[in-house]
């Protein structure tokens, strides 16, 4: 159970660890058992959704750690130098950077579930789990032990999507608190070593770890989405999968269902669509994809199932997406008229003649309309933010069912230019080796006052160069080269 609710508690724990004979923290069975016990001890507090827990803890820690780091930076190096002081001196820049990075990370944390600890305090569950893991591992972080601990914890208590990502800054804060507590007597050579190096090494490991690969397998509802009947979701890249997960989380937060239930309903809808006969196979494939109900046209069907309660902002965005023309064009007209009217009212009086007012509005029409267009563009991008387009992950290979042709359009002007076009095509090929990736020149001849010849020398040259490329790389089982030429028909009326 996490005990370090204050830096002072971390100080006590540091002294205890320094006095005890430590054993290697590689006993994953003990870690799993501890995770199960912590899971049973933490009681969810549904009445608390946000708190100043992280900011208060950071301020208390920073107030103590900053003077220590400043003193270490000013102190002259001595020989021999205590291990703790050496660790602080050699990693001074890292600790300063980590101090401010952690504060910035807490500013970006969303509302997190809170739990009631056995000591009667209410803290974010992510903080409780992070501290419990580090204490169980004796602050010696490793990828394997962290994965084992979180996996065991989630066997009885499922962490939400945002909680998993909050574990990273929560662990960094706990480690900084330990460094703060253990460094208070770092200049006292009579004091025993406090093993500051373990905490700093763990901080370095956390910063160097590829967290996308570590946390994605821990997302509980992600395993449901990977059962996508269309087989599309597992083949997508991380950013696209994360887009789906973010949409699912936002939907769950505004509904009567949990993240797991929303994922289950999306999967059920996709399976029902797969079993329903359809005359359009392409549409049937789309509707059998879980993304169709998370980010696509089927999202309303999913929201009806889970009891979605849209916010006012969501209603406005949905209305704008359904009626873009009715929003954009009339908006420009209204803003143009409003700007013109405002300027005319400020520059005229009750004795100004109507003809002069009309002339002023005509003069202001062009600049006001330009300003209105810019303002509408800003409002549109502010209300409807761009999103990642879902895409497949072809970083390792392009499967046969996604065979791709890269077509380069070009005009054939002269022999030198044709040879350069083919050379550039070969360069593209050499930078993208794949048996299912093919390259083509989409060629045409420039306009001419006379009909084009059937045996144009530039066309023949380009075709021969493409043929030579195919022969050159024929034995390497990679993509092929093509030339797709458009034979133009002479138009007597236009004389081209």
Spans of features found by a protein language model:
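Basic/hydrophobic alpha-helical interface regions
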Residues: 2-4, 11, 41-44, 48, ...
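Carboxylate/His-rich catalytic cores and anion/metal-binding grooves
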Residues: 353-379, 383-387, 445-450, 457-469
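Feature representing long, continuous alpha-helical segments
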Residues: 127-131, 147-151, 177, 314, ...
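Internal catalytic domains of large membrane-associated glycosyltransferases
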Residues: 190-318, 387-496
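ATP-dependent phospho-/nucleotidyl transfer catalytic cores
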Residues: 20-120, 148, 165, 479-495
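Active-site activation/catalytic loop segments of kinase-like enzymes and analogous catalytic loops
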Residues: 122-164, 171-185
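Juxtamembrane/interface segments at transmembrane-helix termini
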Residues: 187, 346-349, 371-393, 419
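Alpha-helical bilayer-embedded segments of polytopic membrane proteins, i.e.
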Residues: 169-178, 317-377
